[in-house]
Every structure is written in C-alpha cells, then in structure tokens.
C-alpha cells in the first residue's frame, strides 16, 4: 500500500465498456480485494479512507461500488503488514480496526545464522512448484464441519476464562496487567 492508493484501487471500479457498436455501458472491474488470500503490505502507509475500505470489506465480506453490492469470494483471508508507527508517512490503525485481525505478530531481525540461511535461499533457483495440499472447496467443507460440531459448556467457560485473563482490567495475572494495554474484544471470543 502507498499513500496515493485510493479505495477503488483495491475494491474495483466501474469502467465504460464501449466494445459494443450500438451502446456503451458501465461494467464492474474487480480490484485485488476479490481474491481468496489478499497480501496487503504496509497497510498503514495508505490513507485512513483506503484503510477503512479494506477493513470494511474484511468485516462485511462484500464491496459496495456505485451503489451495487459485490460479494467477496469465500473463503476470504487477509495477511497484512504494517510499518512501525514511528516511521514517517504512516497512518496508525485505530484499535477498532486492528480488532478485525486475528493476530498481531511483531517481527524483529533474525539471528545471524537464520539470516545467513535466508541469504543462501534467496540466491538459489527455486522454480519447484509447491505441492497443493488443499483447495478452497475442501477448506469450506472443513469449516462447515467444524461449525456443526457441538460445543460443551465447559469449552465456552474455558474460552471466556482465557479471554478474561488476557484483559488487564479483569485479570489477576501481574505480567498481563504490566504488559498488555488492550485486551481482546468480544470478537476474539
């Protein structure tokens, strides 16, 4: 993502189709968000308006352009990166928007031995195609099976205990109180 990226650059646009000799009409040209796995690099470099368009599509699983709704493919997942907030040209994501992501992993520099491995791999010819182990129809089927499984009361209690003990204002765990600013929202449950 870049500062000049507009919402329609990721969502899509209506374009004038003049391929017919008798009439012109607008047709929707889908943007990159219409994929099952969207890799969004440096999302906090985009303007808040563009960030909002991406995050709204993540929440609603659809896009609205020119008053028309377009469903996103299923499954739909977003992997995103952010630049550190203290870098110039970044727009911080509000907590309500960060909450749409399942996890936030801070990555530091690798150890020298690991970095050496990265350097060696980056100079190899890696033209071997990775093996396909799952297609999206199977993933949807497995998700449906998991959703249909009965969940016992003890599991709900266990999940809520984990969530409650991850919130600094409701836990007795000292390290959580000292190191966690914002606990998980109900969406995490």
Give the label of every model feature segment:
Residues 117:
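Acidic, glycine- and histidine-enriched catalytic cores of nucleic acid- and nucleotide-handling enzymes
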């Amino acid at each position: 993502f870049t500062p000049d990226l507009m919402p329609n650059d990721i969502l899509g646009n209506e374009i004038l189709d003049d391929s017919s000799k008798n009439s012109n009409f607008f047709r929707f040209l889908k943007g990159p968000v219409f994929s099952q796995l969207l890799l969004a690099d440096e999302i906090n470099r985009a303007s808040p308006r563009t960030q909002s368009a991406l995050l709204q599509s993540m929440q609603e699983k659809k896009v609205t352009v020119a008053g028309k709704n377009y469903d996103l493919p299923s499954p739909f997942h977003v992997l995103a990166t952010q630049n550190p907030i203290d870098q110039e040209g970044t727009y911080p994501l509000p907590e309500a928007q960060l909450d749409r992501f399942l996890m936030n992993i801070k990555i530091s520099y690798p150890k020298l031995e690991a970095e050496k491995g990265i350097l060696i791999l980056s100079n190899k010819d890696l033209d071997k195609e990775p093996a396909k182990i799952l297609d999206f129809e199977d993933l949807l089927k497995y998700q449906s099976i998991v959703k249909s499984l009965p969940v016992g009361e003890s599991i709900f209690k266990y999940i809520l205990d984990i969530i409650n003990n991850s919130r600094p204002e409701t836990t007795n765990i000292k390290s959580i109180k000292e190191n966690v600013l914002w606990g998980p929202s109900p969406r995490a449950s």
